[in-house]
Amino acid sequence: MDGTDAEAPGQTAPSRAESLVAHAEASISEDALLAAARERAVDIGAGAVTPAVGALLSLLTKLSGGKAIAEVGTGAGVSGLWLLSGMSDDGVLTTIDIEPEYLRLAKQAFAEAGIGPSRTRLIGGRAQEVLTRLADESYDLVFIDADPIDQPDYVVEGVRLLRPGGVIVVHRAALGGRAGDPAARDAEVVAVREAARLIAEDERLTPALVPLGDGILAAVRD
């Protein structure tokens, strides 16, 4: 048997998994613009994807074609910068958040990165309402990083927006492991499990769960 997958002496399976995630995070470096956006996110208490999650977003965006991207949950622009890094030069990021201050800081982050206003569309409001106004099958990638309670609604709308071959990406899909705990049955866990069920049972989608951040559930549409 190949020994490369064997646990190191004295290392349990959970600690090995944690070490792998830590290594993945440490392997990604962020430039000064991302670091500044992340610092502003911390200052205002806005969530921000980890560097490894950001790198994965950039990769998936590039693989999807990266011309039209929709984001639910702008934050201070950290994830937006990562998404834009994988987009084509003429691609447009549509990002939605209910918090005006988050949108202001994201706009600042994009401007500091030299991203022209024609490349981004920042929309304030409840995502459930805004998403219904976006056109069917018009997006290469939809990234959901908002209140887990509303994940099922966002997944339904997000899949509708995807063109064939497009990718939906859901952050906080494992809630740091709580979603996989049979004893956990709070409202967030129930909602996240329902979102995962919707994706798993949609025959148009091919999904995979990636153990980065609070869990990344990604699926490509046939």
UniProtKB/Swiss-Prot annotation:
Residues given in the record as S-adenosyl-L-methionine binding sites: 49, 71, 73-74, 79, 97-98, 147
UniProt: substrate binding residues: 145
Keyword Coiled coil part of the UniProt annotation: no
Domain of life: Bacteria
GO MF: O-methyltransferase activity; S-adenosylmethionine-dependent methyltransferase activity
Pfam families assigned to the protein according to its UniProt record, in alphabetical order: Methyltransf_3 (PF01596)
The protein's Enzyme Commission number: 2.1.1.-
Keyword Methyltransferase tagged: yes
Broad class of enzyme this protein falls into: transferase
Gene3D superfamilies: Vaccinia Virus protein VP39
GO biological process: one example: methylation
Keywords: Methyltransferase, S-adenosyl-L-methionine, Transferase
Family named by the database record: Belongs to the class I-like SAM-binding methyltransferase superfamily. Cation-dependent O-methyltransferase family.
Name listed for the protein in its UniProt record: Putative O-methyltransferase MAV_1364
Organism: Mycobacterium avium (strain 104)
